[in-house]
Amino acid sequence: MKLTKILIASTAMAAVAGMANAEAHMANDMTIVSWGGAYQASQIGAYSDPYLADHPGLSIVYDESSAEAVAKLRAMNEAGNITWDLVDVEAADAIRLCDEGLALEIDADEVLAAAPDGTSATDDFGDMLVSDCFIPQIVFSTTFGYRTDQVPAGVEPPDSACDVFDLETYPGKRALNKRPIANMEWALLCDGVAYEDVYDLLETDEGQARAFAKLDTIKDQTVWWSAAAETPQLLADGEIFMGSTYNGRLFSVIAEQNQPVGMAWDWQMLDLDGWIIPAGLPEDRLARVLDYVMFATDTQRLADQAQFISYGPARASSAPLVGKHAELGIDMGPHMPTDPANGANKFVNNYAWWADYRDDLDAKFQAWLAQ
């Protein structure tokens, strides 16, 4: 018995010493790049606060530059000075960064925790692993919110992305993202193009011209946003009637802020968001990031994030653990973009297509905006 206690104590001391030794070789500060607003707050609540509780000597700084991540990482790489440690990006940007060698390739089963039942990370994330550099977190959608108190009398509220183009039925200012993704698809879909033909058509000059012509019909009534928090604020202030943003942002303004805002789910664009690790980090910074990522993407942590925002967890094992909102106590399941009741029509961001065409269409879109 005495020997057993000694062995157990020795083993425990060795484990503690091992953890301390590993911690000693990790950086004591970390810069995480995200999107700000309700989404970043959900990451802090589900990932960073619990991680910091276990690592009191660590300092985490958030940089709200995810929208410019590709351009800024290119510039950092050119200058040979990578100041970011972990970057939250959409899947299409992760593919581009990976293709350009600006993001670290990972082995998911080495870097990410297995599910509680032993299912490998590769199997648990499944099709969400769209790039060798991408570490999935959430499924979200880009959809539309509208002011319920500005719906004309006797008119049904908008329920589709296509209603944004109907200025006659729904007069008032719009808000759209200042980039081509989703806007180009909506323009063609709402101009009568079948979804299965959208991307083939967008590869042609004629298809692009048709999309821009459709967007021209609302251009002078549109506020163009670059930060996802802008549309919820414009809606809350009553400065627009209808605008696009991420579904979690709309959930926040509706459920948490009690603003007179509704959601039009039909033709929402489903998307993936997650982490990339910049290539070329020093060993101590990389060790810290890998430790944080394994913690922040485990089954429980991804389920915990859904307590703060209505984005679906990217792990299959996390979905059954999604429960009620941390403060409001409401069931979060019906507020997820993947709920079958939320829109008869939806489409998934064509990540590979946008990775190939993004730079070209970005330039054309900005030139069109400047006209």
Feature names for model-found ranges:
Residues 37-44, 83-84, 89-230:
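Extracytoplasmic ligand-binding site segments that recognize negatively charged/polar headgroups
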Residues 278-345:
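Mature extracytoplasmic/periplasmic domains
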Residues 24-96:
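Early extracytoplasmic/lumenal segment of secretory-pathway proteins
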Residues 208-217, 256-279, 328:
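Periplasmic-binding protein-like
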Residues 145-150, 188-189, 272-285, 304-307:
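A bilobed periplasmic-binding-protein/Venus flytrap-type ligand-binding module shared by bacterial periplasmic
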